[in-house]
A protein has these predicted regions:
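Short, conserved catalytic or interaction motifs in soluble domains
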Residues: 28, 53-55, 153
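Acceptor/aglycone-binding surface of glycosyltransferases and processive sugar-polymer synthases
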Residues: 13, 20, 24-28, 32-42, ...
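A conserved acidic beta->alpha catalytic loop
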Residues: 1-9, 55-56
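Short, charged cytosolic
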Residues: 146-159
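Short beta-strand and adjacent tight-turn residues that come in two discontinuous sequence segments
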Residues: 50, 78, 151
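Short beta-strand-to-loop acidic/aromatic patch adjacent to the donor-nucleotide binding site
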Residues: 46-54
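Flexible glycine/serine/alanine-rich "lid" or loop that lines and gates the nucleotide-sugar donor pocket
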Residues: 143
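Single conserved hydrophobic/aromatic residue that forms the stacking wall/gate
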Residues: 161-170
Length: 170
């Protein structure tokens, strides 16, 4: 998504080794939600995993996530149990956001929910069929209504640097 690091080159190398790995790259930052939607459009597999590239989400959970899909869940999502390592002001505003959203919305938005999740093709197709222009995926995941298994883990420190403007933009 307009990243200036070496992520795109690394993904291209992975694609050379495994054609199931694909890169969706943009010339500029188009925003998280639009980037997620573009990734869903590109994904063709029976299962789709979504995770941040900054390693805050433990890839080691994938086998466990897949085992729950095999047990019949449509989606396996993750949430952090603490906000350890996060700036206190960001934690405060995040908690307030979830509290307010859950008061005014009929769709539950899980506090601490991460974008890291594994979904069946049916879930992804349902999301893609929505005509929403301004998307909020955490709300959409709840709204489409598929059975979701939640896995919890401790918050990890991001390998990217957060700046004050980034905190306010997020």
């Amino acid at each position: 998504d307009g990243s200036k690091d070496n992520t795109a080159a690394e993904v291209r190398k992975l694609h050379e080794k495994d054609e199931r790995v694909h890169l969706v790259s943009f010339s500029r930052n188009i925003g998280k939600e639009a980037g997620i939607y573009a990734g869903f459009q590109k994904a063709k597999g029976d299962y789709v995993v979504m995770m941040d590239a900054d390693l805050q989400d433990p890839p080691s959970l994938l086998p466990e996530m897949f085992s729950y899909i095999k047990q019949g869940y449509d989606s396996v999502a993750t949430r952090r149990v603490t906000r350890k390592g996060e700036p206190p002001i960001r934690s405060f505003f995040a908690r307030m956001f979830y509290r307010i959203m859950n008061k005014i919305s009929k769709t539950e938005i899980v506090d601490g929910a991460r974008d890291y999740r594994l979904m069946t093709r049916q879930v992804v197709d349902s999301i893609l069929s929505m005509c929403e222009y301004n998307r909020f995926t955490k709300g959409i995941f709840g709204w489409v209504g598929y059975e979701t298994k939640w896995l919890e883990y401790e918050n990890a420190v991001s390998y990217t640097h957060l700046t004050l403007p980034t905190i306010f933009r997020v």
